């Protein structure tokens, strides 16, 4: 039996992959499905192919295939294509365009005048990379779809109880999990997909250096509701991203804008959930200056958690009876069904971990 601890994007996707392959699976989640205590909630996460690293460009292609596989299995649309823009005084789009070209990813390099004609509601003053395959992932619907299909494929789900004990048996061939409601679950393999809660678990293995931060996101109403906004990556004095909000922004069309960095160090257990007013001021100022198609005062805001490694790569590795499938360093949502497949492969002995995702990698 394989136990999966954590039913966020990674854990839910792993349980779905394992169950659809016919394995005996128990999924354990401390909170409700879709809870707000981690990193996997909300209606809007960016999917993009544009990375300044050929490794991740290739990986996004594999992830796109897995998204369509999940949508087909769940009969639920989860990834909405919008196109995406990369720009900013510190984001040279030309090297990224070269990587996309090498991977046969459709894209355009645009002068500011041409880009401004196409997206007049964005103030564009430099070169822009556009790639049409970018889009928006609904995290809430994805988690719900994965859990539902995992159960329909035969998985057991234990929801609303925390794992309080993890003991490797003397033979090292089984792991005993204890939960706060008194259950004892014996598994041959345990997939840990706890995200920001990972450092709180008492695991018999060494974890890499991790930083948990509280991030803030803000939703700004569109001045013209009929405009179709792309996703945005902006690197300059500020490092921001933007994308259509979905239901998180309320009943009228909104765009989510947030800083990718400048999070506040915290832990999953001690986070305040209080939005940082200095971040609100910076992001609102950016919207006022660069996104004239949005009203500059946010109509909704929220916090979430990043769990980041030193090199900002993921951790997807096996150590004895454990598979560690988190953290995702603030850019893992777009890869969720692919990471689930990787973790399932490790849990069943079908593959070796990628060197960049190993627990003991340098850095």
Give the location of each predicted region.
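Glycine-rich FAD pyrophosphate-binding loop
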Residues: 19-40
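Dinucleotide-binding Rossmann-like beta1-alpha1 core, especially the glycine-rich loop
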Residues: 44-118, 125-127, 239-240
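Glycine-rich Rossmann-fold phosphate-binding loop(s) that bind the pyrophosphate
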Residues: 6-10
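C-terminal catalytic lobe of FAD-dependent flavoproteins
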Residues: 286-363
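Helical element adjacent to the flavin cofactor pocket in flavoenzyme catalytic cores
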Residues: 130-188
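Active-site substrate-recognition segment that forms the wall
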Residues: 16-20, 77-79, 196-320
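Short hydrophobic core segments
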Residues: 3-5, 28, 184-197, 340
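Short beta-strand to alpha-helix junction loop
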Residues: 58-59, 86-92, 130-148, 274-279
């Amino acid at each position: 039996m394989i136990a999966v601890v954590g039913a966020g994007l990674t854990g839910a996707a792993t349980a779905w992959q394992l169950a659809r392959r016919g394995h005996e699976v128990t999924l354990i989640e401390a909170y409700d499905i879709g809870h707000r205590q981690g990193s996997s909630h909300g209606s809007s996460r960016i999917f993009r192919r544009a990375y300044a690293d050929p490794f991740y460009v290739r990986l996004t292609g594999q992830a796109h295939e897995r998204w369509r596989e999940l949508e087909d299995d769940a009969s639920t649309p989860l990834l909405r294509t919008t196109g995406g823009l990369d720009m900013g005084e510190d984001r040279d789009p030309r090297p990224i365009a070269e990587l996309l070209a090498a991977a046969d990813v459709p894209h355009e390099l645009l002068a500011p005048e041409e880009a401004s004609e196409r997206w007049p509601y964005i103030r564009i003053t430099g070169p822009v990379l556009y790639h049409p395959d970018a889009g928006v992932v609904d995290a809430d619907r994805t988690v719900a779809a994965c859990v539902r299909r995992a159960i329909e494929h035969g998985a057991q789900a234990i929801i609303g109880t925390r794992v309080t004990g993890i003991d490797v048996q003397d033979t090292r061939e089984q792991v005993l999990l204890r939960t706060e409601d008194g259950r004892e679950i014996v598994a041959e393999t345990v997939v840990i997909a706890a995200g920001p809660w990972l450092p709180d678990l008492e695991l018999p293995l060494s974890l890499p250096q991790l930083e948990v931060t509280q991030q803030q996101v803000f939703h700004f109403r569109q001045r013209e509701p009929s405009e179709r906004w792309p996703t945005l990556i902006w690197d300059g004095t500020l490092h921001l991203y933007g994308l259509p909000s979905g239901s998180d922004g309320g009943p009228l069309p909104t765009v989510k804008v947030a800083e990718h960095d400048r999070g506040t160090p915290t832990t999953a257990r001690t986070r305040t959930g209080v939005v940082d007013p200095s971040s609100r001021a910076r992001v609102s100022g950016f919207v006022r200056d660069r996104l004239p198609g949005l009203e500059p005062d946010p109509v909704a805001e929220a916090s979430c958690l990043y769990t980041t490694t030193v090199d900002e790569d993921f951790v997807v590795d096996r150590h004895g009876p454990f598979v560690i499938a988190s953290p995702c360093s603030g850019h893992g949502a777009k890869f969720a069904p692919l990471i689930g497949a990787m973790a399932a492969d490790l849990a069943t002995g079908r593959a070796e971990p990628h060197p960049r995702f190993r627990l003991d990698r340098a850095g």
